[in-house]
């Protein structure tokens, strides 16, 4: 399935599980009372989950190499150019906003049959391709993309996710026979 000693692989898997617990608790309360968690409780849980993921990210991931130079993890590159920007502590704020925002964005699009799944399929498909390329030093040097050590392992996990989403879409398209719920939509958005 995947290399569980790979820190990139574990980061995505652990973040998926943490956000799945957040979504499951909301679905469980919704099942028992008819209403889900309040917005404050839901955002508090997701904020704590996001901070846990960012802490795990800081502790376990290395930087990347780009055109024979090594950069720290707070640097970002503009694709297909030679520009590298070090965001410093603002990088973690950006990570926080992206994780929390995408988790809730996918949750909002889950209201219509097949909408969340269809849009996630294209996004995760593109990310799968990028992780494969970013994990290969030859491709990255040719395309002026950063080489990220051990990130190619995510291709396996994301491919599994793509396959399961394709199977889910068959039963979630109009008229939907099954629904994703918060336990599915929130962790998928956080994974993106």
Feature annotation, model-predicted:
Residues 1-24, 53, 58-76, 90-95, ...:
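Alpha-helical transmembrane segments
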Residues 4-11, 31-45:
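Membrane-interfacial loop-to-helix junctions in multi-pass inner-membrane proteins
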Residues 39-48, 113-119:
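Alpha-helical transmembrane segments and their helix-start/interface "positive-inside/aromatic belt" motifs
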Residues 30-39, 76-84:
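Membrane interface segments of multi-pass transport proteins and intramembrane proteases
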Residues 85-89:
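Residue-level signature of the cytosolic catalytic core of signaling kinases
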């Amino acid at each position: 399935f995947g290399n569980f000693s790979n820190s990139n692989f574990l980061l995505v898997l652990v973040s998926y599980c943490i956000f799945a617990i957040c979504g499951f608790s909301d679905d469980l309360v919704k099942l028992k009372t008819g209403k889900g968690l309040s917005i404050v409780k839901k955002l508090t849980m997701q904020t704590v989950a996001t901070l846990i993921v960012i802490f795990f990210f800081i502790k376990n991931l290395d930087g990347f190499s780009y055109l024979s130079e090594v950069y720290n993890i707070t640097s970002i590159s503009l694709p297909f150019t030679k520009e590298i920007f070090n965001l410093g502590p603002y990088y973690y704020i950006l990570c926080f906003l992206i994780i929390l925002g995408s988790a809730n964005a996918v949750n909002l699009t889950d209201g219509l049959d097949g909408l969340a799944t269809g849009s996630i399929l294209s996004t995760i498909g593109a990310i799968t391709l990028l992780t494969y390329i970013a994990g290969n030093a030859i491709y990255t040097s040719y395309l002026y993309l950063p080489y990220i050590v051990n990130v190619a392992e995510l291709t396996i996990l994301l491919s599994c996710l793509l396959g399961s989403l394709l199977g889910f879409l068959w039963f979630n398209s109009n008229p939907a026979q099954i629904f994703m719920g918060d336990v599915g939509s929130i962790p998928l958005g956080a994974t993106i």
